[in-house]
């Protein structure tokens, strides 16, 4: 009897296995989203950051998936991505209150919002996708620098148009916007060149930081002059507080950008959170938001001041804006081609 039962079970088990097959191991294992610094080329290394790097030469889908993974660029991506979404919301509010089509004095306001959204979006994209390969690392950060140049000119235009005092306008009206366009392009070129030559010493910092410092000094001069010339307390000028905030936030952002703080104090402890570049992003976002509030208040409240100043333009600011965008994109493209040749040559000599 027992033998007959065993024989029946032996015939039944194969059929059960066919109905309920055993789970097979996945042909495509879950990808590894982060690796140690030793597993990526030195080009991708960050000072004092030893883990949290993403592997190279994965699919584009892989890098887009890392938007929702922990790695050492995640905070950099999200700070500027969320800020870009906030700017879209702010633009929607502006569209409901500002006549961008009918009011000729509203165009600089639209340009500064567009420029801010551009630099935030390109920055988020660069930090998200730069780990694809050496070539794309260079190319996306070149594009990031284009966004910075666009934002620099947009800021200069908004300050010159809405925030400037008549006394300072009389001194700089013929040179301000052409110089702002040139310095924005020079800042983009210097940053791209510094990235290309990969010299961390004095030469590299000079190429990147000196043009940017000169551009900021010119761009913020209408605001600085107004702050210094205004009586204290300026209760009748609510935009002035936002202008002061944007200056403070920018200086803090510049300090964290240059000093690699606090990761230099806690090496190996700031892989995901607490990097100086992340704090640079946060303070730059705060600077941009404070700036937009100040410019919006100036657009509404200072019309009797700025309308007479801009009845006749010595320069076409829309043309200068497009020139800044076009020249910066061209510079980034040309340097990306130099990078391609350099990488191809390195592969041939290996």
Curated annotation (Swiss-Prot):
Molecular functions per Gene Ontology: nuclear steroid receptor activity; steroid binding
InterPro entries (UniProt xref): AdipoR/HlyIII-related
Keyword list, A-Z: Cell membrane, Developmental protein, Differentiation, Lipid-binding, Membrane, Oogenesis, Receptor, Steroid-binding, Transmembrane, Transmembrane helix
Cytoplasmic side, ranges: 1-80, 127-139, 187-239, 300-318
GO cellular component: plasma membrane
Membrane topology, Extracellular segments: 102-105, 161-165, 261-278, 340-350
Segments crossing the lipid bilayer: 81-101, 106-126, 140-160, 166-186, 240-260, 279-299, 319-339
Signal peptide: none
Subcellular location: Cell membrane
Pfam families hit by this protein: HlyIII (PF03006)
Membrane topology: Multi-pass membrane protein
Gene Ontology BP annotations: oogenesis; response to steroid hormone
Family: Belongs to the ADIPOR family.
PANTHER family assigned: ADIPOR/PROGESTIN RECEPTOR-RELATED, MEMBRANE PROGESTIN RECEPTOR ALPHA
Additional comment: Non-classical progesterone receptors involved in extranuclear signaling are classified in 2 groups: the class II progestin and adipoQ receptor (PAQR) family (also called mPRs) (PAQR5, PAQR6, PAQR7, PAQR8 and PAQR9) and the b5-like heme/steroid-binding protein family (also called MAPRs) (PGRMC1, PGRMC2, NENF and CYB5D2).
Job description of the protein: Plasma membrane progesterone (P4) receptor coupled to G proteins. Seems to act through a G(i) mediated pathway. May be involved in oocyte maturation. Involved in neurosteroid inhibition of apoptosis. Also binds dehydroepiandrosterone (DHEA), pregnanolone, pregnenolone and allopregnanolone.
This protein's name: Membrane progestin receptor alpha
UniProt organism field: Sus scrofa
């Amino acid at each position: 009897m027992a033998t007959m039962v065993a024989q029946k079970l032996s015939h039944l088990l194969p059929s059960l296995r066919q109905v309920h097959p055993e789970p097979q191991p996945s042909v495509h294992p879950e990808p590894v989203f982060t690796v140690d610094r030793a597993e990526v080329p030195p080009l991708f290394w960050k000072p004092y950051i030893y883990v949290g790097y993403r592997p190279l030469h994965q699919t584009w889908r892989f890098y887009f998936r890392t938007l929702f993974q922990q790695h050492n660029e995640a905070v950099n991506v999200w700070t500027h991505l969320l800020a870009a979404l906030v700017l879209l919301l702010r633009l929607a509010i502006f569209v409901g209150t500002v006549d961008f089509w009918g009011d000729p004095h509203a165009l600089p306001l639209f340009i500064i919002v567009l420029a801010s959204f551009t630099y935030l979006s390109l920055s988020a994209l660069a930090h998200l996708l730069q780990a694809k390969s050496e070539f794309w690392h260079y190319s996306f950060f070149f594009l990031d620098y284009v966004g910075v140049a666009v934002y620099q000119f947009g800021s200069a235009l908004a300050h010159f148009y809405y925030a400037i005092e008549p006394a300072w306008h009389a001194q700089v009206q013929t040179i301000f916007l052409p110089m702002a366009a040139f310095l924005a392009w020079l800042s983009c070129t210097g940053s791209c060149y510094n990235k290309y030559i990969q010299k961390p010493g004095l030469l590299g910092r000079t190429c990147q930081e000196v043009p940017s410092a000169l551009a900021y000094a010119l761009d913020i001069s209408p605001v600085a002059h107004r702050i210094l010339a205004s009586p204290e307390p300026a209760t009748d000028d609510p935009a002035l507080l936002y202008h002061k905030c944007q200056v403070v936030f920018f200086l803090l952002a510049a300090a964290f950008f240059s000093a690699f703080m606090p990761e230099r104090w806690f090496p190996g402890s700031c892989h995901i959170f607490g990097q100086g570049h992340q704090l640079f992003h946060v303070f730059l976002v705060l600077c941009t938001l404070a700036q937009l509030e100040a410019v919006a208040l100036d657009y509404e409240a200072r019309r009797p001041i700025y309308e007479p100043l801009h009845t006749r333009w010595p320069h076409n600011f829309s043309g200068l804006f497009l020139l800044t965008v076009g020249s910066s994109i061209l510079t980034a493209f040309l340097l990306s081609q130099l990078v391609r040749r350099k990488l191809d040559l390195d592969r041939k000599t290996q």
